[in-house]
Structures are given as C-alpha cells and as structure tokens.
Amino acid sequence: MNALFIIIFMIVVGAIIGGITNVIAIRMLFHPFKPYYIFKFRVPFTPGLIPKRREEIATKIGQVIEEHLLTETLINEKLKSEQSQQAIESMIQQQLQKLTKDQLSIKQITSQIDIDLEQVLQTNGNQYIESQLNNYYTKHQNQTIASLLPNQLVTFLDQHVDNATDLLCDRARNYLSSAKGTQDINDMLDTFFNEKGKLFGMLQMFMTKESIADRIQQELIRLTSHPKARTIVTSLITNEYQTFKDKPLNELLDASQFNEIAENLSVYVTTYASKQANKPVVTLMPQFVDYLEGQLSSKLANLIIEKLSIHLSTIMKKVDLRGLIEEQINTFDLDYIEKLIIEIANKELKLIMSLGFILGGIIGFFQGLVAIFV
C-alpha cells in the first residue's frame, strides 16, 4: 500500500512538473515583452523569444512569402489563368452595364476620378488648341495651300473644279429667271435711266422700259448657256483655283488673322465638347458602347493581363513585398502577435501542454519504481 502511494504521488508530482514546465516554456515564447535588469545585469530569458527575435522573424516571414509563396512566377501563372481573365472581363462588363443603366455622361465619369472636365476644357483645352494651331501656322506658313491640303482632297477638287461652271451658270440662270431677278433688273434699269435721263428719253421713242428689261433678262439668260460664256467662266474659275492652290498660307492669312481664327475655333471646339460631355455616353456613342460590350471587354481584359504580365517584375520591385510584410509585422503589438499565434496554433499548444503532463507522469512513475526498489 505504501509502495502504491509512492508511485501515485511521484506520477502526480511528475505530471504537474512536466505540464507546468511546458506551460512556462510556451509563455516564455511571448513574455516578458521587454528585458528586465537587476542592477546592471539583464535577467536571463528576458525578453521572451518572439519579442527578442521579432525583427528577425518578420524578415524571415517576408523572405519565405516572397521567395516561396507569392513568387513572380506564381502570380504570373495565376494572372494568365482562365479564371483571372474571366474575373477581369466580368468586372469590365459590370462597369459597362452600369454605364448604360445609369445613363452616365463623360462629365460624370470624369468627376468620379476628381476631374472637373468643364474647367479642364475651358482652361487647358483652349490653350492647347490655340497653341497647336499657332504652332502649325508658324511651321507651315510658307507652304502652299495645295501642299497643306490632304492629297485625296486636292485630287477630288481637281477632278470636280470644272463642275463649278455648270453650278454657277445654273444658279445664275435660276436667279435671272426668278421674280427676284426680274425685279433686280428693273431696279438697276431705273437707277441707270435716272442717271442718264436724255438717253432714256431717246429709247422711249422705240421701246418701253419693261421691254428693255425683258430683252436684257432674256439675253443674260441666253449667255448662261452660251459655249463661249461658259468657256470664259471655266477659264476664270480654273485660274483662280490654281492661284489659290499656289498661294502660301501667310499670303492667304497673316499671323494676326490666323490667331483670331485659332481663338474662335478653340472656343467653339471646347464649348461644343463641353455640351457633348453632358450627354449620356450611350446616347452620344451607341455603336461604340455596343462595341465595348460585345468585343472590347475581352480584348481589354487580355490587354490588361498582358501589360501586367510584362511589367510584373517592375511592379513587384516597386511594391517590395518583403519589405511591406516586414514593416507590417513590426507594426503589430506584441499582444496581438501572441493572440494571433495562439489562435492559429491553439490545438497544437494544448497538445504540447498535455504531452508535458503525460511525460511528467511517466517519468514520475519510473521515479516511484526507483524509489521503492533502490
């Protein structure tokens, strides 16, 4: 009976010592948070292991995550996966659907990124357009009009300049045949005869003013169809057209005239753009929105992935993942780190404490046997 009591007592004492030792060892991982001193001598095992090695732990965790977990290769593979492409494309589609559903205008879209589009147009827009136009004038002022116009436009004008004769003669004939043309001829005759009274008196002996006006009108109408008259008109138009093409820009418009045009044009363009910016994008550019929803979303997703993949190395260097993790861990309170580790390894820590009690009990059992038989 005495031997059994000794064995049980030794088992209990050994279990208590083993369990408490492991509990203290676990506590010493975190506590104390700062070193303690007796006189000038630091107390051993202060601070605890984790507070003492905090910076080293942060560095190692950052290194492990950067070199083995969130590696450039792994991120690149994940980025190029079908799942990532679908996620990016879905996000783009959602934004496009919101654009259509909410009837967002360009001005509203830019305001979401803190850009006052109207102010930008009225200040920077005016200055930019004026500057570009004036720079163009300075650079090309000595060049001919023909050299400044697009080749296709010059070719088109060359091919159709002869049509101006038909157009001009037709318009003249229509005008002369109209009531307005008749009235204008009569008015000019009245002015002429008032200035030349004697001549009118002589003509009245042979015909009336109305018959004179009618005769003049018929002759003018006939001239619009006469081959000789049309040849003269064609020659004049062709010569003037060629003269216009061969003129340098600065002969057609001097610097002050061009600057005035540039100012007026910049105001017109920015005002027009400002008005259009208030209209819903889906109303302003319906075909473009359809194109965005139908085809561009997939192309844009591929472009985003491609550009991110190309610049991933640079991005990761700029982000400095290791340094970011180190900095973040070093900002954590030690209480929070302790709580975090205990939450993660709670089950394992309890097993360690239980193992301490079990091993202590086993050692106590053998110590009891030794105490009985020795």
Swiss-Prot record:
Subcellular location: Cell membrane
Its membrane topology: Multi-pass membrane protein
This protein's UniProt keywords: Cell membrane, Membrane, Transmembrane, Transmembrane helix
Residue ranges of the TM segments: 4-24, 354-374
Major subcellular location class: membrane
Source taxon at top rank: Bacteria
A GO CC annotation given for this chain: plasma membrane
Alphabetical list of InterPro entries matching this protein: DUF445, UCP032178
Family listed: Belongs to the UPF0754 family.
Protein name stated in the entry: UPF0754 membrane protein SAS1767
Taxonomic lineage: Bacteria, Bacillati, Bacillota, Bacilli, Bacillales
